[in-house]
Amino acid sequence: MLMIRDFSNRFQQISGMPINSKGGKDMLKRAGIDTNSKQYQAVMKSMSAACSGVGYTNVQAIKNRMSRYDKDVDYISPVTGLAGLVVTEKNRAEKNRIIDIPESSRDEMFELAKKEFLQENGVGNGDTTRRSDVYLNLYQKMDKNDRLAAGNTLRQYERAYTQAFVDAVKAIDPKWEPGKPIPSGALDGITRESIDNLLVQSGGSLVKKTSSGSTLDIQV
């Protein structure tokens, strides 16, 4: 049974009262917790699912957990402060959808991907990349219900930009491999628009059109 413990002296004096009793609910109400709210119900459900039966908690812990849900009971990421980024049964289909995203986000990704490609000689370095900042900036521009799809769309552009850089370097040096020096000026003629114009949607992906009009999957 979920119990209340150590919330102010009053709660300490009557520690152990069942949270689902009338007295327990009255105490929660006096502490500013609406036990009829969707956030409260979501917290109780998640806490019950996390253990066999229900464990122990205190009022402040419940308040903290409730603050992690918005009015629609969508989880708010403590990292980004945004909702709509956790895959659930409700939004699962969104994570593989392609949608229109701001041109500014595509510009930001192109410029950063190019800079890091040159700095790391084409090696993807998860320790130093700042691309997560580009995604966060995008999510902040999007409606909550479009954030998963926007992230998927930006990933497709990110892959396309990186592949275009690889192709450009290999056009100059066919034996080039990631980690080897990149020939000076190898990426000078590449623009974001030139890459974007070659991409078409195929299901939940963006693929490159060939000269014949067919599509070519991008592999990076």
Where are these regions (language model features)?
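Type III/flagellar secretion export determinants
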Residues: 1-220
